[in-house]
């Protein structure tokens, strides 16, 4: 059964230059856009100098909202309430599809951070950043086109998410 698109939810498609024209697997993930005043909650990797909207892979049997709650607690130490899915992004790279759901969310409390080994190695930590600064950082996605396709794709995705969802 096909899910109905929520009213007010936007959808965009990003196709990488290495996309092979069809995909044989889909990775689903959920991310949270958490805004307080004029600041947004981001995850920052101190060792790689990389910013991202917090979230991660949806586990088997897990609802999208449960994924948002779990991932934000693990990565940021915040308990959040996902309000609504504001954006769906379909990304295509190689022979894979990445389906990302962005939920507008609010903070409800604190949790214990539980980072993966890779996140620990990269020095991941939560940071609050003015929205305009986050948009500025992510807007520079094209400067990584020749040197870092992973970061280019990540920053293009996050820039697209913020500019589609936040109407400032």
Predicted stretch roles:
Residues 24-26, 94-99, 118-123:
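A generic structural micro-feature
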């Amino acid at each position: 059964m096909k899910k109905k698109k929520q009213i007010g939810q936007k959808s965009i498609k990003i196709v990488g230059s290495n996309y092979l024209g069809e995909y044989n697997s889909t990775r689903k993930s959920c991310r949270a856009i958490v805004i307080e005043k004029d600041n947004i909650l981001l995850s920052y990797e101190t060792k790689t100098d990389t910013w991202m909207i917090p979230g991660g892979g949806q586990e088997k049997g897990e609802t999208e909202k449960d994924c948002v709650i779990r991932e934000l607690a693990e990565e940021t130490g915040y308990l959040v309430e996902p309000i609504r899915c504001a954006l769906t992004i379909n990304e295509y790279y190689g022979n894979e599809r990445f389906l990302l759901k962005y939920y507008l969310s609010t903070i409800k409390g604190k949790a214990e951070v539980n980072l993966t080994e890779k996140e620990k190695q990269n020095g991941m930590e939560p940071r609050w950043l003015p929205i305009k600064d986050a948009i500025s950082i992510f807007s520079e996605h094209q400067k990584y086109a020749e040197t870092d396709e992973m970061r280019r794709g990540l920053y293009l995705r996050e820039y697209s998410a913020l500019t589609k969802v936040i109407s400032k």
